[in-house]
Amino acid sequence: MKITNVSAIPMSAPVPEDKRHRTDLGTKVKSDATLIKVETDSGLTGIGAALGSPPIVAAIVEHELAGECIGEDPIFSERIFEKMYNGSRSKPALERGVPQADESRRRGVIMEAIAGVDIAIWDVKAQALGIPLYQALGAVRSSVRGYASGGWAPGDAAEAELGGYAAKGFTAVKMRVVGHDGFSIPNCVRRVKAARRGIGPDVELMVDAHGSLEVSTAIKLARALEEYDIAWFEEPVSPDDHTGQAEVRRATTIPIASGEREFTRFDFQDLLERRALDIAQPDVARAGGMTEIRRIAALTSAHGVRLAPHAWGSGVLFAASMHVAMASPNCHILEVTQGYMPMMWELFQEPFDIRPDGTVHAPDRPGLGFTLRKDALEKFRYIDGPEFVF
């Protein structure tokens, strides 16, 4: 089996005005994704998804990465990843057994493009083996607990919003704590207190600051929230401030989660060495695809850090994240978006299997296990412009 073509398709889904949420990132007006296809001479086609600006990702995939994949056997997924990662130095890197990453490919949008291609290659690989992708990765489980990820409502309205997630059956929920109606610690505490009222004492509650606070404020907020039994405080400070995040972790009893904006195992190695996190949240469509996220899972496990993949995006990204969760021993929970995300729920012919108790169950079909709807590419045609506006 050989790869014959690699292509990328930019996609968007506009958000109706009555369904837009606002955070420190701005008001969400659309969702973007890049769908990646890897075709083979066997007739099998794999699909992947990448984060990053879709037109830029598509150009990188089709004009730079495709040529490094065509002619390769997708069974050799590690080899193909190393070719994409090391670029022109891939041959000496493999011969010497030492990573020699191309300077432009270590992080950023090129790594996001590599991640998307890698997901598609693993999809083809598992299809060729005739087994679900999580089994090709090394199955640990066939279901995992999901948590409802949302929580934008202002003030006391957080009680009904988060309570609604619990009413759906989720035993863990997450809310945003910065940016909706003006940041202040008293306002954040008010919203978290309302959320706790809405979900009761037995549902886990996580909070997410989107990396928008400075260290001193993050510490003050964490200490103010400790009495509300917070399961984790996500991205308290900028993802570029690993030292600051470690300071926050040392200053609070709340576990610290982060990682959705990190690239490859090397970023996570730095977080681990600084003892900056308790829960790692790599995004499979950013951190390096299936190949690299397996390495991240093993690395974090060696440090006693749990895995909770970031899974906010298209249906392809969620499906890939689900397979990661099923194949990672240290994964304990999976993100399930509660925002308006038609590219997640309306992309495939088959529905996701999320049970009334909030557990997510893996498909038993080969590969990712999902088939694109015939009208998907037309329905989600790319729309130029930013995803968030102020």
Language model: regions and residue ranges:
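Structured beta-strand/loop patches that form or line metal/cofactor-binding pockets in enzymes
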Residues: 1-47, 51, 339-347, 387
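Conserved, mostly hydrophobic/aromatic
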Residues: 3, 43, 65, 117, ...
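Shared catalytic-loop signature of beta/alpha-barrel
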Residues: 223, 229, 240-359, 363-366
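Metal- or metallocofactor-binding catalytic centers and their adjacent structured scaffolds
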Residues: 39-128
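Glycine-rich, aromatic-flanked loop segments that form ligand/cofactor-binding clefts
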Residues: 108, 112, 118-154
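Metal-dependent enolase-superfamily TIM-barrel catalytic cores that perform enediolate-based chemistry
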Residues: 142-252
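C-terminal extensions of enzymes
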Residues: 348-390
